[in-house]
């Protein structure tokens, strides 16, 4: 995107998020003036298998399950929540296991902004600089696994493990209601 002009570079691309300021700067440095045009909206789901226990999770509970860092006794610490009931005793004692899109994914960007940053701002009352630094990284201890961009594969993995959660767009989920 915006690497240059000519046959070897695309004239049109699409994304599931707005153009970032850093991308606009990259475009400008390559002599390109990007035109952003919104075609529609989608949503993000946090889903598990149809045959699984259906949990009613808050954004705060999801944040606490997937964020690399959480607040404990007024300090930002590594996330040590192992089960959903560690986060909220009313949730079942099942291991936290979440499939996440890769860092290159617009779905991940949207999730980080709409769930992680938004929740972190509210529950920890942090400045933008602080919450972006402390609340952007996903866990790397096995509770969260990058699953790639293939939503069909994520569906297969959710079907194979009833306790696992995954994220993808609402429009994709709508097409896969039977799963």
Mark where each language-model region is.
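Flexible loop/hinge segments at secondary-structure junctions
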Residues: 2-179
């Amino acid at each position: 995107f915006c690497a240059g002009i000519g046959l070897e570079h695309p004239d049109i691309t699409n994304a599931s998020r707005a153009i970032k300021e850093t991308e606009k700067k990259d475009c400008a440095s390559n002599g390109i003036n990007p035109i952003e045009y919104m075609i529609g909206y989608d949503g993000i789901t946090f889903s598990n298998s149809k045959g699984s226990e259906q949990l009613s999770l808050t954004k705060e509970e999801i944040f606490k399950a997937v964020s690399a860092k959480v607040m404990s006794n007024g300090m930002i610490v590594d996330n040590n929540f192992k089960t959903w009931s560690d986060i909220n005793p009313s949730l079942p004692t099942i291991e936290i296991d979440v499939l996440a899109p890769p860092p290159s994914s617009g779905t991940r960007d949207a999730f980080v902004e709409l769930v992680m940053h938004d929740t972190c701002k509210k529950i920890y009352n942090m400045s933008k600089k602080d919450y972006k630094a402390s609340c952007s990284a996903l866990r790397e201890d096995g509770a969260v696994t990058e699953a790639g961009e293939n939503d069909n594969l994520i569906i297969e993995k959710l079907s194979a493990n009833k306790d696992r959660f995954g994220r993808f767009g609402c429009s994709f989920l709508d097409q896969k209601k039977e799963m």
